[in-house]
Amino acid sequence: MTNKIIQQLEAEQMSKEIPTFAPGDTIVVQVKVKEGERSRLQAFEGVVIAKRNRGLNSAFTVRKISSGVGVERTFQTYSPQIDSLAVKRRGDVRKAKLYYLRDLSGKAARIKEKLS
């Protein structure tokens, strides 16, 4: 049982509007990147391979192929570093964790699109 004050603080920090997405979906994450004095937005587009729902400690992992090399990045869902999330495509998968995609490449790593 968590303290009421802690619950209230977590609820305030979780007030950000996040679209619903699931493993297999292709999403675009706009990340705030600070370079010296200036700040800019960097888009990271890829397939969600894992999602961890733990309230304020929720996180998700996105995988993309960049210059022929697989790149994975784990984001905290309610992080202030995330500016926005957009779902580009819904994937039709049967597993919650898509770690098997790490071993696949090319056409074998494609995910069917959910129809509906």
Swiss-Prot record:
> What InterPro entries does its record include?
Ribosomal_bL19, Ribosomal_bL19_CS, Ribosomal_bL19_sf, Translation_prot_SH3-like_sf
An annotated GO cellular component? cytosolic large ribosomal subunit
Matching entries from Gene3D superfamilies are given as:
2.30.30.790
- Keywords assigned by UniProt? Ribonucleoprotein, Ribosomal protein
An example of a GO molecular function for this protein is: structural constituent of ribosome
Instruction: Please give the biological process terms from Gene Ontology that the record holds.
Output: translation
Which superkingdom does the taxonomy of this entry point to?
Bacteria
Q: Tell me if Cytoplasm is a UniProt keyword of this record.
A: no
The text of the family note is: Belongs to the bacterial ribosomal protein bL19 family.
Its biological function?
This protein is located at the 30S-50S ribosomal subunit interface and may play a role in the structure and function of the aminoacyl-tRNA binding site.
Q: What is this protein called?
A: Large ribosomal subunit protein bL19
Question: What organism is the protein native to?
Answer: Pseudomonas putida (strain W619)
